[in-house]
Regions:
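Generic serine detector
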Residues: 10, 25, 33, 42, ...
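Small-residue (G/A/S/T)-rich helix-start motifs and N-terminal tracts that mark the onset
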Residues: 1-83, 90, 94, 211, ...
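YjeF_N-associated NAD(P)HX repair module
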Residues: 2-5, 150-255
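Nucleotide and nucleotide-moiety/phosphate-recognizing core
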Residues: 37-124, 128-129, 135-158, 166-189
């Protein structure tokens, strides 16, 4: 059994489990998000301010799902900060956002924009969005923000295993804001954003985690090069991907 695999192999194992073994992607996502949420809940109580930073892919979808699970556990100070082109959101991400918005306790999602491109930049550390508050400066039920608000706990769900090129543009600014506000505790979902999940290299900028909750198998990017310095404590959580899927992935992409 391969206990450490590359991010590329992990992604291939996910696809094999979904496409060949017919395991629903949302089932895997629900399990992964629940494991990450349970880890956070074991460390911090329902009164904790938690900011979940999400990209538009399935790592971001994990983050949104995690937020909804925490709401269901009685956490009421959960905020979502989104980054990326809405047109590039995955089907799973959109499903998780609809599920989030269906919860009466949800807070208004915040959409990060670079300060240079925002026509009316705000001051750093805007006030937290209140549950069910009306959006005041964006269509689609979102609040546009050029800065991230301070928080007690930061959840990094931006890139996960999918990053293999330098971080640029609004994503670089987003990660820089995450680095700026990081204070008490940061949990990375699967892989700290900015770390190449295969090589462990920093792709221009990366977010320092205190704990990385990674799914199925540990990733080579967490133990190679600069990966260990950014991953913090590495916790591997089983999410129901069969060994057959990992074996197929390693055959397809030998490291």
């Amino acid at each position: 059994m391969n206990t450490i695999i590359t991010g590329t192999q992990s992604k291939a194992a996910d696809r094999y489990a979904i496409d060949v073994m017919k395991i629903p992607s949302l089932e895997l996502m629900e399990t992964a998000s629940r494991k990450a949420a349970e880890e956070l809940a074991s460390r911090f109580g329902p009164e904790t301010d938690i900011l979940i930073c999400c990209g538009t892919g399935n790592n971001g979808a994990d983050g949104v799902c995690m937020g909804r699970i925490l709401l269901d556990k009685g956490y009421r100070k959960i905020r979502l900060a989104l980054c990326g082109d809405p047109a590039k959101e995955t089907e799973e991400f959109r499903f998780q956002m609809e599920t989030w918005k269906a919860r009466p306790e949800h807070t208004q999602p915040m959409r990060f924009v670079s300060a240079e491109s925002d026509p009316a930049p705000a001051e750093p550390n805007p006030a937290p969005a209140e549950p069910d508050s009306a959006p005041d400066n964006a269509a689609g039920g979102e609040i546009r923000i050029p800065f991230l608000p301070d928080t007690g706990v930061l959840v990094d769900a931006v890139f996960g295993i999918g990053l293999h090129r330098p971080v640029e543009g609004v994503y670089r600014d987003f990660l820089a804001e995450m680095v700026r506000i990081r204070k008490t505790f940061t949990l990375a979902v699967d892989v700290p954003s900015g770390i190449n999940s295969d090589t462990g290299e920093v792709m221009g900028i990366a977010v320092q985690a205190d704990v990385t909750v990674t799914f199925g198998r540990s990733k080579t990017g967490l133990v190679r090069a600069e990966g260990p310095a950014f991953a913090g404590e590495i916790l591997v959580k089983e999410i129901g991907i069969p060994e057959e899927a990992y074996e197929a992935a390693v055959r397809q992409y030998p490291d």
